[in-house]
């Protein structure tokens, strides 16, 4: 039961705090980083830097730091809470974002009052179950974790008769962390998971204006891989609007993956030459092979460790197992295809989640659709394809070099 001084302190705290709870600290929870052993600090430092980058355009001032195995974000008095949370939800490596009430240690009676005020302000409906979970990293604190749990639970039950304890599946899990200061939180906003960008190298994404390739870039970057991208432009057959669409897609992906170096390759002359010299049922696969060659050139030049495509088995003629085998033959870098076993509906769901879908379906054709054959080969034979490419030997090296030389490179973020 509450004694008179406790009840008075709770009343004074409720009066002081009113009904306007604001959060000026976020506790950042991460997953796999916690099991990285001796290299853990490298992943933590990368995550801190990614958080700083994500918040740089958010209204307000933010201090991001790590201490005692935790990452915190301290916020200025006035900042955009919703925008800050949305930005943090795009940082790979974060599994949870906890809005925290940070308190100075003014004794246990004051902590009781603050906990009651927190529960009162956070939960209008008190017909819930709860559990208190205390962590005490400050070992000289006068109570141990079990005593803190029991005493704070008792004061909550006294203050709100309709609330009940459930230690197994509570509606509210009130976390109390006793450090130099005291941290209260009960909400965990989900993050995207994964690993911080750049902790697993860099790869080259073949980016088109379609639905699949932006999703492929997102999925690989989620594992800590930085992205560059190559886009094949075919003026005048593809418009400036088609090119801008791809730039816009790169910007959307960069919200998660960080700045993306985008190589825009003029592919028109190569496409026309292949169209003129090669069997039309093999156009798609031969053009695809030259796209891979050119993208790999830039990948190696910028020390990428692999290539990324949005291919899924059997989705179109160039994505059968035989076609992928023939396409791979021109590459020495590994080719990562994160969508390889996914249905189109699953890919669309991810594109909607990362906000690329509406841009991807804008009706501007890219070079892959302009020169498509009516009846493309679905089971290409590698020897036959190489034989057909011999028809290109007179001029293809010159056109390849010209495409490399005239590339337009921009950085989008």
Question: What function would you assign to each model-found segment?
Answer:
Residues 4-204, 214-260, 269, 301, ...:
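RNA-binding accessory domains that recognize and position tRNA/RNA substrates
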Residues 69, 265-270, 312, 365-373:
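A glycine-rich phosphate-binding loop feature that marks nucleotide/adenosyl-phosphate handling sites
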Residues 154-156, 193-200, 271-272, 276-354, ...:
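Active-site adenylate/phosphate-handling loop in enzymes that bind or generate adenylated species
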Residues 205, 229-231, 264, 309, ...:
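Structural beta-sheet core signal
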Residues 210:
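Conserved G/P- and acidic residue-centered "switch" motifs that form tight phosphate/ATP-binding loops
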Residues 358, 362-413:
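The feature marks non-catalytic terminal segments
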């Amino acid at each position: 039961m509450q004694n008179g001084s406790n009840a008075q302190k709770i009343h004074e705290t409720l009066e002081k705090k009113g009904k306007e709870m604001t959060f000026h600290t976020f506790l950042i929870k991460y997953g796999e980083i916690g099991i990285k052993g001796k290299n853990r600090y490298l992943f933590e430092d990368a995550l801190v830097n990614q958080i700083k980058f994500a918040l740089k355009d958010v209204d307000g001032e933010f201090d991001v730091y790590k201490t005692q195995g935790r990452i915190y974000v301290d916020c200025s008095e006035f900042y955009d809470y919703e925008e800050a949370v949305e930005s943090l939800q795009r940082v790979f490596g974060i599994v949870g974002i906890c809005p925290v009430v940070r308190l100075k240690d003014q004794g246990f009676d004051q902590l009781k009052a603050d906990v009651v005020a927190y529960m009162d302000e956070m939960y209008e409906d008190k017909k819930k179950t709860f559990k208190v979970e205390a962590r005490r990293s400050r070992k000289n604190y006068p109570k141990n974790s079990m005593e803190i749990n029991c005493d704070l639970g008792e004061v909550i039950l006294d203050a709100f008769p309709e609330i009940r304890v459930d230690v197994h599946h509570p509606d509210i899990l009130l976390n109390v962390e006793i450090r130099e200061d005291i941290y209260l939180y009960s909400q965990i906003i989900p993050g995207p998971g994964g690993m911080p960008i750049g902790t697993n190298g860099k790869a080259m994404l073949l980016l088109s204006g379609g639905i699949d390739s932006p999703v492929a870039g997102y999925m690989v970057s989620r594992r800590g891989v930085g992205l560059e991208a190559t886009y094949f432009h075919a003026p005048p057959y593809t418009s400036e609007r088609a090119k801008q669409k791809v730039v816009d897609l790169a910007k959307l992906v960069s919200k998660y993956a960080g700045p993306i170096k985008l190589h825009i390759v003029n592919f028109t002359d190569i496409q026309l030459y292949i169209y003129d010299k090669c069997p039309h049922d093999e156009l798609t696969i031969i053009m695809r092979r030259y796209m891979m060659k050119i993208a790999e050139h830039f990948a190696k030049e910028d020390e990428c460790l692999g290539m990324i495509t949005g291919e899924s088995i059997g989705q179109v003629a160039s994505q059968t197992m035989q076609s992928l085998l023939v396409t791979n033959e021109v590459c020495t870098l590994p080719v990562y295809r994160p969508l390889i076993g996914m249905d189109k509906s699953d890919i669309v769901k991810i594109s909607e989640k990362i906000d690329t879908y509406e841009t991807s379906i804008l009706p501007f054709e890219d070079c892959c659709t302009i020169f498509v054959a009516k009846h493309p080969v679905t089971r290409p034979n590698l020897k036959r394809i190489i034989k057909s490419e011999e028809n290109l030997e007179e001029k293809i090296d010159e056109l390849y070099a010209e495409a490399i030389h005239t590339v337009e490179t921009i950085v989008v973020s």
